[in-house]
Design a protein with these regions (language model features):
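Short basic helix-loop element that most often maps to the first helix and adjoining turn
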Residues: 5-23
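Short, conserved catalytic or interaction motifs in soluble domains
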Residues: 37, 62-64
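DNA major-groove recognition helix of helix-turn-helix/homeodomain DNA-binding modules
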Residues: 45-61
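Conserved beta-strand edge residues that scaffold enzyme active sites
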Residues: 25, 64-65
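Absolute protein N-terminus
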Residues: 1-3
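Small-residue (primarily alanine) positions within well-ordered alpha-helices
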Residues: 22-25, 51
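Recognition helix of helix-turn-helix/homeodomain-like DNA-binding domains
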Residues: 26-41
């Protein structure tokens, strides 16, 4: 599942609207919509705010690519 789908699904399960999530995170409605539709490139700070409100844990995985 992609991150936008996961965020939308969790928001829906919690009975929150996009506007609710916008209010709780203090992010604009436009940002919430763009994150859920995976348009643009949200910052780590933005994803942390959303994850915090939705009760999700944000895990970052770093892979080393041989050059």
């Amino acid at each position: 599942m992609k991150y936008g789908e996961l965020i939308k699904e969790r928001r829906t399960v919690l009975g929150l609207t996009q506007q609710d999530l916008s209010d709780y995170t203090e992010l604009s409605l436009r940002i919430i919509k763009s994150v859920e539709s995976e348009k643009g490139n949200p910052s780590l700070k933005t994803l942390e705010k959303i994850a915090g409100v939705l009760g999700l844990e944000l895990i970052m995985r770093v892979n080393i690519i041989n050059e």
